[in-house]
Amino acid sequence: MATILVGYDTETAAVGEALSLFTESPDFPSYRLALDPDTCRQALELLTEVHADVGVPATLFVCGRTFLHALDAVQAAHATGLFDVQQHTFTHTPFKDIVYTANDVTGTIAASPPAALLEELTFTSRLLREYLEVECVGLRTPFGYHRGLRDRPDLLEIVRAAGLRYVTSWGRNEENGNPTPWVQPFTYDEEGYGDILELPFQFWLDVVWFDTHGYDSGPALLDALKGAVDHIAREDLVYGACFHDWVAIASDERRVGWLRSFLRYALAQGVEVTTYTDYWRRTTGG
């Protein structure tokens, strides 16, 4: 059965380092929303309405800094039972060197050292345990990479050492852009980490789409997403969808409704919509 895993990178107030490289971008007014913790509160209220209305769950991949600065909002979203909460590091720290271009402005961020990665993962998992009573098992790596963590046993060792059981890190194509091809979930057996499941996030990230096509292109994104639903339904694929808290506000989801309509369309086509963690659990027996 075709399946969509819905995940929201919940990163408002944790991405200032990255966004500081794009102050000259014409999209910076939209990016500014990602600096204000109140954006996270607005977004989670909106996402709760959307998911309650459509009747499907999702995973929030939360940065630790976002979690602490919008704690009440994340707790309220989790309490609805609609959202599984996993992590997105503490400060949106990269596992690999990042080079990203948006509107002819290019930003470069170096990969974080191993000790920083491990401490960020460990600390964020502790926060989720302390404030939500959640045992964190999943990680969305910031940015996403072509081939995920393939051929990087050093990074997989950090993931394992932090007690994480699945990672969603393959989110770029060979040109470091989107759309990402429909590579399917796999375990890192070749690297010696068969206990770690990779759940790629394919097609278009919402932020990459809007950076490419403009933040007023929600209707066009909906058309593209419907095409993706048709494709996975026909080929019986797993689609790891990646959206962002602040992008729901920046793209005016409440008025445009591209996200709500996408979820409704998926259900209408007989596609299962679930969380990343649910898929990991039933695939691995975790």
Residues covered by each model-derived region:
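Acidic (Asp/Glu)-rich catalytic clusters
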Residues: E45-G55, F67-T93, R129-L132, R160, ...
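C-terminal domain-boundary segment and adjacent tail
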Residues: Y166, G171, P219-G286
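Catalytic domains of cell-wall/extracellular-matrix polysaccharide-remodeling enzymes
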Residues: L68-H69, T108-E198, D252-G257
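Active-site beta->alpha N-cap acidic-glycine motif
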Residues: M1-D84, E135, R140-G144
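Hydrophobic faces of well-ordered beta-strands that scaffold small-molecule active sites
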Residues: I4-Y8, A58-L60, V85-H88, V137-L139, ...
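A conserved mid-domain beta-alpha-beta active-site/ligand-binding segment of alpha/beta enzyme cores
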Residues: E191-G227
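Surface-exposed, active-site-proximal loop segments in enzymatic domains
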Residues: S20-F28, F95-S112, W209-H213
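Acidic-and-aromatic substrate-binding clefts and catalytic sites of carbohydrate-active enzymes
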Residues: D36-R41, F61-D72, T93-I98, P114-L117, ...
